[in-house]
Amino acid sequence: MSNRGRLGDAFLRPGSSSFLDFLSDHAPELLPGRSAAAGNAPLAPHATTIVALTFQDGVVMAGDRRATAGTMIASREIEKVFPADDYSVIGISGSAGIGVDLARLFQLELEHYEKIEGSLLSLDGKANRLGTLLRGNLPLAMQGFVVVPLFGGYDLDRGAGRIFSYDATGGRYEEHEHHGTGSGAIFARGALKKLWRPGMDAAEAVKVAVEALYDAADDDAATGGPDPVRRIWPVVTTVTAAGYRRVPEDELATLVDALLAVRTERGRLA
């Protein structure tokens, strides 16, 4: 009888609930940080600014759309914010290609766990898993291919939105109220400090996130602001008890038009 089309023994053998463990055993060359030769990092696209903030019902995460390679704009439409699962979201800054792969692997890790265990991993558990994945990229980070993610989600046990930041070694740190990462984060975080307030609703939090990215783009060449001419808007997402939601582009267009009208009226003081 032909074995053609049948899954191999590795796929049928009971094992860990971690997809990372499975990949480490059977295809380690596919993991981040396992295939680079020593040497200087070539000029590769970099993703830039990500912001996140909590609001009354959950968390908002947003990212600009620009990727740079040195002084050149490599892309005006890259997406840096992705759903990790139904109740969490990940944003990536740093080496764009590796960051996108890391986000996809993290999605698979959470999906694999849910299929094996029959339940969702806790938000703290998800944050820890992301730190483990990031630590696997350390050899590449030592060569200049650094990825720094931002993770947020709705904690079903606490009934609140939470935010986690990371360093290049996989260290995990819980942030309160708001945070930003990437080249424009210093400017975005200044805006968040001024605009964030307790008890905001989702619409207010989305507006604050867009304003923070606008301020970052105003001072950081590697961060792209809203582009009304090309109709390119930031990726803005919310996560609440109802789950993950990406804010539609028509809503963002209306919000940006209002924001630009106010700032145009202020002139040089905007």
UniProtKB/Swiss-Prot annotation:
Regulation: The formation of the proteasomal ATPase ARC-20S proteasome complex, likely via the docking of the C-termini of ARC into the intersubunit pockets in the alpha-rings, may trigger opening of the gate for substrate entry. Interconversion between the open-gate and close-gate conformations leads to a dynamic regulation of the 20S proteasome proteolysis activity.
GO molecular function terms noted in the UniProt entry: threonine-type endopeptidase activity
GO cellular component: cytoplasm; proteasome core complex, beta-subunit complex
Subunit annotation: The 20S proteasome core is composed of 14 alpha and 14 beta subunits that assemble into four stacked heptameric rings, resulting in a barrel-shaped structure. The two inner rings, each composed of seven catalytic beta subunits, are sandwiched by two outer rings, each composed of seven alpha subunits. The catalytic chamber with the active sites is on the inside of the barrel. Has a gated structure, the ends of the cylinder being occluded by the N-termini of the alpha-subunits. Is capped by the proteasome-associated ATPase, ARC.
Compartment list: Cytoplasm
Keyword terms, alphabetized: Autocatalytic cleavage, Cytoplasm, Hydrolase, Protease, Proteasome, Threonine protease, Zymogen
UniProt entry tagged with the keyword Transmembrane helix: no
Catalytically driven reaction(s): Cleavage of peptide bonds with very broad specificity
UniProt similarity note: Belongs to the peptidase T1B family.
Domain of life per record: Bacteria
Protein name: Proteasome subunit beta
UniProt-listed GO biological process terms: modification-dependent protein catabolic process; proteasomal protein catabolic process
Catalytic machinery residues: 48 (nucleophile)
EC number, as in UniProt: 3.4.25.1
Propiece residue ranges: 1-47
Pathway: Protein degradation; proteasomal Pup-dependent pathway
Pfam family, one: Proteasome
